[in-house]
From Swiss-Prot:
Record's protein name: Tripartite motif-containing protein 54
GO BP terms in the entry: cell differentiation; innate immune response; microtubule-based process; negative regulation of microtubule depolymerization; signal transduction
UniProt keyword annotation of Transmembrane present: no
Localization in the cell: Cytoplasm, Cytoskeleton; Cytoplasm, Myofibril, Sarcomere, Z line
CDD domains recorded: Bbox2_MuRF3_C-II, RING-HC_MuRF3
Keyword set, alphabetical order: Coiled coil, Cytoplasm, Cytoskeleton, Developmental protein, Differentiation, Metal-binding, Microtubule, Zinc, Zinc-finger
Species name: Homo sapiens
Region span, Mediates microtubule-binding and homooligomerization: 168-211
Functional description taken from the UniProt entry: May bind and stabilize microtubules during myotubes formation.
Protein residues bound to Zn(2+): 126, 129, 149, 155
Length: 358
């Protein structure tokens, strides 16, 4: 069915805007978040400038250097929940930006800049009966229509319902879907943060194992050089394979989060549509998209201990004639034995006193 459009004034919902503004206040400066907005591991948000100020206050030594920005690691506590936030070498610039909050701020500022009485309410008019407004909803055809169409027109044999009833029902359904989607986004964000930490742990463990490997090979003669290169390559391949897998998962989760955030933004904008008929023309499609997005199954996470590189530990207590058979010993921590500065092995521990294996 085709419709024509008429207009009449509509008041804005100032109460909803006030409630939204309260959710966009930074707990430090007590002002609306200023970009960039960063999300802490505890899922609270701060202006990046405010996060930097909190860090400086918690670390007087940094202030004594005359620095106004943080360029390496440190820690501070979240002002909302007191959770300790540990920074990497990038400082507060290593904290992830919350693009969803930034987008909501932009939408809020755009909406709040409009006069409350400047909007016009659109009334869809029935094309079949030009003087009749669209005021009922055909449940059989799932389209808005007018009363005369029900009495005399194409929908006289259809089941209908009042337009406000269907409007409230579908708006409630979309609102519930958005809530589920936002909750899912929070879980995805937490998983991404966890997997980024896994990447860092893999890199740290790999770096530590490489250092141990180099220290031990440096104490041996030239015959070890070829074998050392082979083992380093094996370790590097394993590191790269693990990092590629985890980073691939991060990309998948990130793509899902981006698509979900865009859908949330689109749904929020749709819910702000004050006209029931206009809203209902697009609500069904949005509801289906939100439902489908909330049911998407994401790829699994790395299994527990996936970041471990302990299987690349090397012992140097083997006899010289067996040097070319040295290989990694999975499960060995690589921390029991020490190499003396002159190249001689340190005091043997319980494992080193055992006879060499075959």
């Amino acid at each position: 069915m085709n419709f024509t459009v008429g207009f009449k004034p509509l008041l804005g919902d100032a109460h909803s805007m006030d409630n939204l503004e309260k959710q966009l206040i930074c707990p430090i400066c007590l002002e609306m978040f200023s970009k960039p907005v960063v999300i802490l591991p505890c899922q609270h948000n701060l202006c990046r400038k405010c996060a930097n100020d909190v860090f400086q206050a918690s670390n007087p030594l940094w202030q004594s250097r005359g620095s106004t920005t943080v360029s390496s690691g440190g820690r501070f506590r979240c002002p909302s929940c007191r959770h300790e936030v540990v920074l990497d070498r990038h400082g507060v610039y290593g904290l992830q930006r919350n693009l969803l909050v930034e987008n909501i701020i932009d939408i809020y500022k755009q909406e709040s800049s409009r006069p409350l009485h400047s909007k016009a309410e659109q009334h869809l008019m029935c094309e079949e009966h030009e003087e009749e407004k669209i005021n009922i909803y055909c449940l059989s055809c799932e389209v808005p229509t007018c009363s005369l169409c029900k009495v005399f027109g194409a929908h006289k044999d259809c089941e209908v319902a009042p337009l406000p009833t269907i409007y409230k029902r579908q708006k409630s359904e979309l609102s519930d879907g958005i809530a589920m989607l936002v909750a899912g986004n929070d879980r995805v964000q937490a998983v991404i943060t966890q997997m980024e930490e896994v990447c860092q742990t893999i890199e740290d463990n790999s770096r530590r194992q490489k250092q141990l490997l180099n220290q031990r090979f440096e104490s041996l003669c030239a015959v070890l050089e070829e074998r050392k290169g082979e083992l380093l390559q094996a370790l590097a391949r394993e590191q790269e394979e693990k990092l590629q897998r985890v980073r691939g998962l991060i990309r998948q989760y990130g793509d899902h989060l981006e698509a979900s955030s865009k859908l949330v933004e689109s749904a929020i904008q749709s819910m702000e549509e004050p006209q029931m008929a206009l809203y209902l023309q697009q609500a069904k499609e949005l509801i289906n998209k939100v439902g489908a997005m909330s049911k998407v199954e994401l790829a699994g996470r790395p299994e527990p201990g996936y970041e471990s590189m302990e299987q690349f530990t090397v012992r140097v207590e083997h006899v010289a004639e067996m040097l070319r058979t040295i290989d990694f010993q999975p499960g060995a921590s690589g921390e029991e034995e020490e190499v003396a500065p002159d190249g001689e092995e340190g005091s043997a521990g319980p494992e080193e006193e055992r006879p060499d294996g075959p």
